[in-house]
Amino acid sequence: MQDSPVGVRFGDYVSAFTSGGTIAAAWDRGEWYRRGYQMGMEHRGKGVDVQLGPVVGPLGRNPKGGRNWEGFSPDPVLSGIAVAETVRGIQDAGVMACTKHYIFNEQEHFRQPGGFEDFGFVDGISSNVDDKTLHELYLWPFADAVRAGTASIMCSYNKGNNSYACQNSHLLNYILKGELGFQGFVMSDWSAQHAGVASTLAGLDMTMPGDTGFDTGLSFWGTNLTISILNGTVPQWRLDDMVTRIMAGYYYVGRDKTAVPVNFNSWSLDTYGYQHAYAGAGYGLINQHVDVRGAHGAAIRQAAARSTVLLKNVDGILPLTGREKFTAVFGDDATENPYGPNGCSDHGCDNGTLAMGWGSGTSFFPYLVTPLEAIKSEVVGKGGVIQSVVDNYAYTQIQALANQASVALVFANADSGEGYIEVDGNMGDRNNLTFWQGGDALIRNVSAICNNTILVIHSVGPIIIDEYKNHPNISAIIWAGLPGEQSGNSLADILYGRVNPGGKTPFTWGQTESDYGPDLIYQPTAGHDSPQDNFEEGVFIDYRAFDKKNITPTYEFGFGLSYTTFSYSGLRVDKITAGEYTPTTGMTKAAPTLGNFSTESADYQLPANFTYIDAYIYPYLNSTDLKTASMDPEYGVDVELPAGSQDGAPQSRIAAGGAPGGNPQLWDVLFSISATVTNTGELAGEEIPQLYISLGGPDDPKVALRNFERLSIQPGESATFHADLTRRDVSNWDTVSQNWVISSYPKTVYVGSSSRKLPLSAKLDFGGY
């Protein structure tokens, strides 16, 4: 298995794909599937069985969350559809997808125990979330991933309601495996397992290194798992269940037929070296340098361009022609990292153009086409003049060049990543929502002089840019996100009109940081073993929070301009006969046991002449006495185990369950929605009509996204938008009945071009449901 959600981590001759948080802006099922399939093919070509991605945790509760860029969107429906298509793509390529991080993993600060005793804590942060918010927000995209057949789910570092996610029986056994009917295996994040038997019985199926410390050879499992089975603490059926779940995923994606031997090494790009790097063992051929990229560069260029969002375009200044009298390019973000595109470990720096965040969710760039080189190629090829200043702090030179420019392209960025790397004082999470590397001063310097300034943003999420939206000299603003290896080419395709922008922002751009509601916890209060993060806002994050508090955003969720214009008309709602919702009833079968095994500890001793590799974890015993073999001073001490977790007898089925993703009737289509979208401009373009619903209750969002479709329309022509509303789409989670219910509140559907531009609406008739 291998990271990452944007490509094969540590591999050479691999692609650096557009990030999840950027390609979400394409709002295109086909684009998400293709990206998943291409990533899957590259992992498969390198010999990887499990791709550690995609990501829907973090969902994006706060825009400063360090790993938001690895996921898709703070909207659960947009994220849910994107993750489902990505899972299908990865697994159709013959690789198991590992959807992560389950669940409530919404910030990097304090995600793991240790290192913050000064605050009075010894454990990782606890995300405290109510049942309604769990189901209607954070669990929603995981349910979509399960329904799409994800072979694996990774549990997260944090606690959920004061129980670590990787030993939280309610979240793993009851919700994930019970209610959602997850058939695959749950694996821990690295160092996310904090107990042995408790994790086993709570639903953890596979552990990753670091549970007791990296490179120690010690584990809560290994020898201890063998002991817990021999002494009866862990029943046989649970071991069989763990193995079955792992192998089910293996066969489900056809690894028995499509597996490729591993042909690279995570710890070295050298051709020859140690297969077991830490132990210094197994010297030989470790890297065959297999090129798995195929034609993916062209696909990445297309995906990044189709994910680019045009936020401002005064008087149609864009697209440019390349024949402007004098093109000036400003900013470190326009050019290359002086140390090379892979010059910082896990991309843990902000040097040069930003095309990927930092951390374990990264991959090496095979190359990185910078904006400056792509723009220069465009302008020079058409006989134009182009000059640049890429030092953000060279104010004298910046002002001199801005005075000459007929068009000024200013590049600025904001980065984030995983918490084990600190960049410019940002420990994974962003400290604020401003530009990095003096970006704001750069923009102000140029725009104060050049009255035709175009701002290009590469960022992990929203930035406070209201000043620039309203600046008379800033003619256009483009958000290009984290586009991957084809950054410059995809941007040039937009700037010079080869691609008509059609992306829509997958998050809200606020006027101030406080607009977003609860902040991340940077300075926790004492009083508990863990910092306590109470998700008191419930389902009201991002645009839902802005709507609830009547805050006007700079740019609303779903917003994006085009070089053409569109109109909406002819909303139609057709009611579909689906019958009444029936809760799942009955009993499960007893947990099966598969064969027999020896209970004699002598049969599990380290085999004679066994070649032991230092710091590797093995299941063998070093003594026939289980207590001695465990090396656990608390062996035999009674501990509290998850209630019912040792009981393999038939269990009552969960009313909201019954199939992967939940009760299968949740996906009954109750309404079919259609509308006409007309291209009223002079250029062919793509529009993304969006379907929202008001569920009508006092505790419901004003509107919530439920569906969308990306349409390609020629000038003067129309296309029909089609979208279904399922039972789940029109339901609320009822905490009393523990099921989805359609409330009696009146419900309205809306169709339009963004969450705040919804010209079409209709009431829904629920008679018969």
Put a short name on every predicted segment.
Residues 1-648, 658-732, 745-751, 755:
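Glycoside hydrolase catalytic-domain context in secreted enzymes
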Residues 738, 743-745:
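A glycine-anchored, Pro-Gly-centered beta-turn/N-cap motif
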Residues 757-769:
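Short beta-strand elements
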